[in-house]
Amino acid sequence: MAPGRAVAGLLLLAATGLGRPSEGPELAFTEDVLRVFGANQSLSAAQLGRLLERLGAAPQQGALELGQLHFNQCLSAEDIFSLHGFSNVTQITSSNFTAICPAILQQLNFHPCEDPQKHSVKPSFSEVWGYGFLSVTIINLASLLGLILTPLIKKSYFPKILTYFVGLAIGTLFSNAIFQLIPEAFGFNPKIDNYVEKAVAVFGGFYMLFFVERTLKMLLKTYGQNDHTHFRNDDFGSKEKAHQPKTLPLPPVNGVTCYANPAVTEPNGHIHFDTVSVVSLQDGKAESSSCTCLKGPKLSEIGTIAWMITLCDALHNFIDGLAIGASYTLSLLQGLSTSIAILCEEFPHELGDFVILLNAGMSTRQALLFNFLSACSCYVGLAFGILVGNNFAPNIIFALAGGMFLYISLADMFPEMNDMLREKVTGRQTDFTFFMIQNAGMLTGFTAILLITLYAGDIELQ
């Protein structure tokens, strides 16, 4: 039991002795309070002030003028003494301590000394829908990044950029789950339940093992030899390739034949964005382009994997929308934190989905269209999340989203972050560079969510 609640209970029991002889349990409880907070079985005005501070009922600023007493008037220790006819130098003993107990309990129950502006006020209807719609729109723009970033895939620096964003996604998703979503599911308050330090320890345990494991691998690994892997993948943008993978022909459309040079698909399902390009052949003349088949092949001729990815991504985005909507009904900072985590995760995932859809036989326009349509399911999830959050306790949604965030960060993106560099890393220096980039991404995401959690009560979104 919290110390403040224990003291409040003692005060209540002591107050029950009002008007009765000071004997029995009432006297024992009174003497306990006087022994802890007073001296020589008596209580001065200053010591009463410390008792009020311990109970969280002390005025934050100077004493207010006493007028007609009412339930929401903030009283200092001197005010309580004055109202009961005691001077500031009077020492309260057990015989008259019960007289001031009702005043202390009144201050403790109604908290009139708290700043009303500090109370957490739920966002208004327009704020929830406005900020929620804006956040989902920004997140959905990530689904269009494939078209913009496809030309950068073959750049030598692209693996470093992608590694940082994958690490950032891991840090934000994992931290948002342990700092925000899971505690909210259990009804914890970071200012009262003091779970933040324990959540930091949870992340610390994960990060410590990651750091030790990667360090040992760098120290013990013999570079320059072929690593034993269950798959092979080409280097990102490598110029030393002996030959390019064979292109896959797509059905002709309007007299134009498209050939998709697919991403390398490993047996374990990992996609490496190194050989994505589309060329067209018309009248026997080769022409490199992003894709001249704007209409694309028939939907029935597109690989099944494309529809599986689209449907799974739509469900994933629906859950994301649920989490965002429920978070914004709680507070704007909670919604912002969840949105940041989802945005960081969507960037590498949407890029990967775009490449998979191209590999399955879609044209660029079709891949963008279906990737964007699956992303729009986030709006549906947002609406459900807001409705549930406003009418019911959203704890179940927070628990569901927290578990999903843990799975995506630890079981999905974390192995992907390591596997994507298996053959890219050719020396200890290169391995160390990517290791530092991974650390920078994860620690950036962790720090951002931690700061939002710690200072959520001091940040105001107007």
UniProtKB/Swiss-Prot annotation:
Q: From the record, which residues define motif XEXPHE-motif?
A: 345-350
Locate the transmembrane regions by residue number.
133-153, 161-181, 192-212, 368-388, 391-411, 432-452
Alphabetically, the GO molecular function entries are: monoatomic cation:bicarbonate symporter activity; zinc ion transmembrane transporter activity; zinc:bicarbonate symporter activity
| Keyword Zinc found | yes
Keyword RNA-binding (UniProt)? no
Write the signal peptide boundaries. Answer: 1-19
Topology Cytoplasmic: residue spans? 154-160, 213-367, 412-431
From the Swiss-Prot or TrEMBL record, state where the protein is found. Answer: Cell membrane; Lysosome membrane; Apical cell membrane; Basolateral cell membrane
Provide one Gene Ontology cellular component.
plasma membrane
The induction text for this entry reads: Up-regulation upon iron or zinc loading increases expression at the plasma membrane (at protein level).
GO terms under biological process: arginine metabolic process; bicarbonate transport; cadmium ion transmembrane transport; cartilage homeostasis; cellular detoxification of cadmium ion; cobalt ion transport; DNA-templated transcription; extracellular matrix organization
Its PTM note reads: N-glycosylated. N-glycosylation is not required for proper iron and zinc transport.
Q: In what way does this protein cross or attach to the membrane?
A: Multi-pass membrane protein
Q: Which reaction does it catalyse?
A: Zn(2+)(out) + 2 hydrogencarbonate(out) = Zn(2+)(in) + 2 hydrogencarbonate(in); selenite(out) + Zn(2+)(out) + hydrogencarbonate(out) = selenite(in) + Zn(2+)(in) + hydrogencarbonate(in); Mn(2+)(out) + 2 hydrogencarbonate(out) = Mn(2+)(in) + 2 hydrogencarbonate(in); Fe(2+)(out) + 2 hydrogencarbonate(out) = Fe(2+)(in) + 2 hydrogencarbonate(in)
Q: Which residues lie on this side of the membrane: Extracellular?
A: 20-132, 182-191, 389-390, 453-462
Q: Its function?
A: Electroneutral divalent metal cation:bicarbonate symporter of the plasma membrane mediating the cellular uptake of zinc and manganese, two divalent metal cations important for development, tissue homeostasis and immunity. Transports an electroneutral complex composed of a divalent metal cation and two bicarbonate anions or alternatively a bicarbonate and a selenite anion. Thereby, it also contributes to the cellular uptake of selenium, an essential trace metal and micronutrient. Also imports cadmium a non-essential metal which is cytotoxic and carcinogenic.
Record family assignment: Belongs to the ZIP transporter (TC 2.A.5) family.
Name this protein carries in UniProt: Metal cation symporter ZIP8
* Organism of this sequence: Rattus norvegicus (Rat)
